[in-house]
Amino acid sequence: VHRDGPDNLLSEFDIGYGDVDAAFDAAPHVFQESLWQHRGGGHSMECRGGIAEYDTASDQLTYWCSTQTPHAALRTLVDMLGRDESDTRVVTPDIGGGFGPKLVFYPEDVTLCIAAMFLGRPVKWIEDRREHFVATTQERDQYWEIEVACDEDGKLLGIRGEIVHDHGAYTGRGINLAANSAETLTMGYVVPTCRMNVKVALTNKIPTTPVRGAGHPQATFAMERLRLGPTLHPNITYKRSNRLPNNLGFQ
């Protein structure tokens, strides 16, 4: 995707606990499931937009925008423009929904401010719905290969597998989506051992960022699918932990 990179692998890491290989070696039953969790998005009633105004006399820059994170947007803006926070304001009025994609600081945000400073007059931009579908960040697009080990009674002994996360062409919020999916896989169940290998891949698609759960729903779907999948042991049982919120793997 990017010529200056050796490949399209943005990041690779393992998340887990316990002796997973020993659990699988000793398990009388091992079952496997392949999952693809396709892309989706947070399609708010109001698309992204902003108005930038620059006062040449006072060197005051004001940016009204539909961000969910005005303080983070301010820090990013002053860093990119080389300005002081005392001379820059980011104002967020009521916005028509956010759901995660409006956490991201987009190129349009800084472009509007640069245009206002260059022209010396207010500049306004509103994203239309077609632009939203091809320019605003999306979520999911994960490929899971996952195995579960259980004993003769269907009791879970361990889970292991691989997640390949389609990150899109650029990174908007780091690798938190893929990490969250792996970290929250075991959820409220007793799973003695777990290890997930996570690969974050760059592709020529729209970047993926948090949308309604930020990776957690993917983990929930995978865990419950393991329980209900047709390839699994008909007597497999999940034991809910009575130790929440502590001492339960990642929880």
Language-model-detected regions and their locations in the chain:
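Structural alpha/beta core scaffold segments of enzyme domains
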Residues: 1-251
